[in-house]
Each structure stands twice: as C-alpha cells, then as structure tokens.
Amino acid sequence: MYWQDEGYLLSKNNFDENSIIIETFTLNHGKYSGIVYGGSSKKQKKKFQIGNKIFLNWSSKGENKTGYFTAEIIKAVVPSFFDDKKKAICILAALSILKTILPEREINKKIYLSFDKLINQFYSENWINKYILWEILLIKELGFEDKVKINNKLDIKEALIFNKNLLLENFMIPNNLQMPFSRNILEKYYN
C-alpha cells in the first residue's frame, strides 16, 4: 500500500539508533503514524520538527501494518513564532489537542482545512480569538455541536476555560486522557 499527502507533524519519538516514529495529521488520510528511517540524522532532523507542514510518502505491506514515511518540508511553522511565546505555545496546544483527541486513520478534511487556516491566522492581530473559535469548531465537528452554547460576552481567559471544560467533559475524562500540558500553559498566559 502506498499514498502521498500533505500534513502536519504532531509528534515524534526516537526509534532504534537513527530512526524516528512520527505521528502526522494529513488532509486525505487523517491521523497516521509511521517510521522514518534516518529521521534523526543531521540531514533529516530539520524536516521533522513538531508543527512543520510536510509532504509525505507513506508505504506499507498492508493496510493495518506499520508504515514507513519519507517526507519533504513544505513550511516550517513553529520557528516563525519563536519570538512570540504565546503564539508558539498556542500552535503547540492545537497540535497536542489534535494528537490527543483525533481517531487514528479517520479522514477529517474539514478539521484539517480549519487547522491549516488557523495557522495562517497567527499572522493577524486577533489570532487568539481565531484560536478559540477553532477549538469550538473542532468540538462541533467531532459530534458535540449540541453541547456548545457560545457566550459572546466572555473574555479570552473565560473563553479558554469554557473550551477547556468542553474538551475535558467530552473527550479527556470519558477516554481517561490528560489535557495537553501546552493547552494548560496557554490558559495561564491569560490570568
């Protein structure tokens, strides 16, 4: 089995001496994991930074077998915001939430496209409002639309807490998951 797609790098872990296991969120295939041989080498390391948008080639001997990735970088996302801690932590929070709550190998084009759009919103002045709306869209898209009652009078901190409670109630607690650390840090920036 073989496919090509674009996606964002959600996580990476060392595997063997020079390889890594990456988890990606792709446009046409959803969340996928696989091995990258030589992924921790000096030549390849720069491609595989969490948050990078990459073009992926995935191959496997079977549909349910562990696959192997090769990749080329499309855009280095997080380094663009190293000078702004709030934006960098916000991007990492979004990536961590996607990693935690999205099901493996389930196509979510609307969520992918909304995340891709969110990344471009970090260049605007009201980026935190766009992030809050993105979290609400994510919760709605995953089937909890009836539980989302938006109060437009909330300030940023209250809106982040509101969204956090929705995530906890609908995803984290029922599945015995922890709220991503970066999401908790983001909330603390607005105390």
Which residue stretches match the model-derived regions?
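Non-catalytic alpha-helical scaffolds and adjoining flexible linkers that form interface surfaces
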Residues: 1-20, 25-191
